């Protein structure tokens, strides 16, 4: 996989926002800031809760704008939050990582790639998604080979062709014409935003209250199914659940909202997915140590948990583990949605958020997700011509081999042995010991692919050091992996994302702002963290007397009926 520093050749905005953050951020590099404070205006004292990607970007842009009194509070003992590239052994293998959080990075995430380029962080040519690399699909006990770049195995032809037809051609339901999602992408790329918005609103009108599964049944068992052949219940829908939409099987998230899945396709997040050579944590590290006006964001980090947030005499007070009360003019909360509710108490009353936003904080669905990685003695798949990814309908849903040192074919291997969502992840919570879990997964894999499984022993048989796993549902700082709306919940994303607009209305401005991917339309993607970080920084500047030009506060509008 050839490394390169990539920026999308053709930038386009995401469908729900119709605003591309990259040009604004690029212009800020020319200007030296996203905004500033005129002479005579004292910049505010700001707290940022969470030193993940969102918190660090918000701090970066506020420091560049001239805000000096900033404190980032981080409950973990590390930076990055859920953007976590865990090292197997920093001394012996400093380049070999386990991406415990985000691990796929599409260039259509233009805000993210702006910051990757700013720090010259490289990506590799592709993530080993099914069909992109040599793949094996195991379904009902039968092995199906899928060579890289070719059509899926014959068993999957009907569901594959039907899904592709839907993406390119759309469908006709009860006299309503729905434009193909990839046609909407083309509209965004060619700046036909009014057409794109109209087309997306029709999808929202028809499917806002439908699950992924129920929508697929409606579309593909009707009288005019995309691809021309109706799907058979239940076999074809199980097949499609195993095949997925590009990045592996989606059966565990069939109950998610259909529009939540569709927007990922329209936004291009399922295409050209990249690996970051040093892991996404390199972005957090670079953000933290960059020099800005004689300081760095990292010097403003306080490793302390923020508990309740309250208001006192016009200031916002934070109760922390090490100091009873700290008062600030503005607070940006990038914590996970469940921490916002259960730790900070933001949804208990209307001190900071109105009832609609409080409900969105409380009710937004977060997925459970688990990962288990193994560092192997060598890159056995190269020597033995084994598949680079295995997808199955068993306990071991998705296996991926990850090559972070493509220039060293004789080096150690990294295998993502188990990446699961929702019920599939919940099952694994019963096996808390990572050695037992790893061995159990290898045993399961042995039943379908013994040639592959025989090599799954950690280097030196050291399970303690060379097997890494994490369950996001039981993570005390997260209580879930990422936002994935249920049917009817897109309105929650709308309320959370546009909360920053209160900065334009002093009578609504409580001084507290929400950020993080869980407060975006793209939960689980780093782009949502970037967008909301920039939003919150702009809101702080505007609401405290600063000056902004060409910014999302004035340019991003809520135009859809969710």
Curated annotation (Swiss-Prot):
Keyword Methyltransferase among UniProt keywords: no
Q: List the disulfide bonds.
A: none
Query: What does the record's cofactor remark say about binding?
Result: Binds 1 FMN per subunit.
Provide the residue positions that the database annotates as binding FMN: 54, 74, 76, 82, 104
Cofactor requirement: FMN
Broadest EC class? oxidoreductase
Q: Which InterPro entries match?
A: Amino_oxidase, FAD/NAD-bd_sf, Flavin_monoamine_oxidase
One Pfam annotation reads Amino_oxidase
Binding site residues for substrate: 104
**Swiss-Prot/TrEMBL keywords:** Auxin biosynthesis, Flavoprotein, FMN, Monooxygenase, Oxidoreductase
Q: Which family does it belong to?
A: Belongs to the tryptophan 2-monooxygenase family.
Question: Which protein, by its recorded name, is this?
Answer: Tryptophan 2-monooxygenase
What organism is the protein native to? Answer: Pantoea agglomerans pv. gypsophilae (Erwinia herbicola)
Name the gene that codes for it. Answer: iaaM
């Amino acid at each position: 996989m050839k490394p390169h520093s990539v920026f999308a050749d053709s930038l386009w905005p995401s469908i729900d926002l119709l605003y591309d953050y990259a040009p604004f951020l690029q212009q800020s590099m020319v200007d030296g800031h996203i905004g500033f404070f005129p002479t005579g205006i004292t910049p505010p004292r700001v707290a940022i809760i969470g030193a993940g990607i969102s918190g660090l970007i918000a701090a970066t842009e506020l420091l560049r704008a001239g805000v000096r009194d900033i404190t980032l509070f981080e409950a973990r003992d590390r930076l990055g939050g859920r953007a976590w590239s865990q090292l197997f052994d920093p001394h012996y293998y400093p380049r070999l990582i386990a991406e415990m959080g985000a691990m796929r990075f599409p260039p259509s995430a233009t805000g993210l790639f702006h910051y990757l380029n700013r720090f010259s962080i490289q990506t590799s040519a592709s993530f080993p998604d099914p069909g992109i690399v040599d793949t094996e699909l195991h379904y009902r006990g039968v092995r199906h080979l899928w060579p890289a770049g070719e059509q899926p195995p014959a068993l999957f032809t009907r569901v594959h062709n039907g899904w592709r037809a839907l993406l390119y051609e759309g469908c006709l339901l009860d006299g309503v014409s729905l434009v193909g999602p990839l046609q909407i992408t083309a509209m965004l790329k060619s700046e036909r935003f009014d057409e794109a918005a109209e087309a997306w609103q029709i999808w929202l009108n028809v499917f806002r209250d439908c699950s992924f599964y129920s929508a697929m049944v409606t579309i593909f068992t009707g009288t005019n199914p995309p691809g021309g052949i109706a799907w058979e219940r239940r076999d074809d829908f199980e097949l499609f659940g195993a095949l997925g939409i590009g990045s592996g099987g989606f059966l565990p998230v069939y109950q998610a909202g259909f529009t939540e899945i569709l927007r990922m396709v329209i936004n291009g997040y399922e295409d050209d997915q990249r690996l970051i050579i040093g892991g996404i944590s390199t972005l957090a590290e670079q953000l933290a140590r960059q020099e800005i006006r004689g300081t760095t964001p990292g010097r403003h980090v306080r490793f302390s948990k923020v508990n309740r947030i309250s208001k006192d005499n016009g200031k916002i007070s934070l109760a922390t583990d090490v100091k009873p009360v700290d008062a600030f003019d503005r607070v940006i909360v990038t914590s996970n949605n469940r921490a916002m509710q259960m730790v900070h108490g933001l949804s208990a009353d209307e001190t900071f958020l109105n009832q609609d936003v409080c409900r969105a904080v409380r009710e937004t669905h977060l997925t459970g997700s688990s990962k288990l990685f193994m560092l192997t003695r060598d890159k056995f798949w190269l020597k033995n011509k084994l598949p680079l990814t295995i997808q199955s309908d068993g306990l071991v849903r998705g296996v991926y081999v990850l090559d972070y040192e493509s220039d060293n074919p004789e080096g150690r291997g990294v295998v993502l042995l188990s990446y699961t969502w929702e019920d599939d992840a919940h099952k694994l919570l019963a096996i808390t010991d990572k050695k037992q879990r790893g061995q159990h997964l290898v045993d399961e894999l042995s039943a379908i692919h013994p040639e592959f499984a025989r090599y799954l022993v950690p280097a030196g048989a050291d399970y303690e050091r060379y097997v890494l796993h994490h369950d996001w549902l039981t993570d005390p700082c997260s209580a879930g992996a990422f936002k994935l709306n249920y049917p009817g919940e897109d309105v929650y994303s709308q309320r959370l994302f546009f909360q920053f607009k209160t900065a334009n209305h002093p009578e609504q401005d409580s001084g507290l702002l929400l950020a993080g991917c869980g407060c975006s339309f793209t939960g689980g993607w780093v782009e949502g963290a970037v967008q909301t970080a920039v939003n919150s920084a702009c809101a702080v500047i505007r609401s405290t007397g600063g000056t902004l030009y060409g910014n999302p506060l004035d340019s991003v509008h809520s135009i859809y009926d969710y």
